[in-house]
Amino acid sequence: LSMHANHVRIAHNEIHDLYYTGVSCGWVWGYAESASFDNVIEYNHIYDIGHFVLSDMGGIYTLGVQPGTVIRYNLIHDIEKANYGGWAIYPDEGSSHMLIENNIGYRTTSTCFHQHYGRENIVRNNIFALGGEGAVHWTRKEPHVSFTFEHNILLVDNQPLFTGPDRGNLKCDMNLYWDVGGRPLIYAPDRLDA
């Protein structure tokens, strides 16, 4: 847990068998100024989190504006929610100006990646696979770019690739999408894209 810290490195840990989030960074809701910046979360193996006991959690959870914070090279899987919210990587309220790259997240009971709301995050070169409710979710459409999503691999099993209020203000480019059953891809609920 790194609440109001900066220049912290959380690396090379095996984190498992917890009822809530594996790594938490930041603790300011919304877009207010935060003491959290330039943190690095890397090379962690995070798994068996939640056990269907708690909700609103992630293998890696962030909160608030965090310029320079980097989440990379983490392996996150088997995240199990009680009622809602079991994600591999979860930038929650106001999480902004972060780089999320080269992570693998799979077998989550919600989507693998969820951004509640935030500004100008870069999400690239990740693999998100077999989320129970799809691959990627965002909660709020905002006037600014919420996140840039590029060069990622999304693997689904008859689930939507993206879920959210609508396409939102996202930049998506150069991603690879695949359904393990060879079915037509569900880009978003109620819409099919071949």
Locations of regions flagged by a protein language model:
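Glycine- and acidic/polar-rich repeat regions and solenoidal domains
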Residues: 1-194
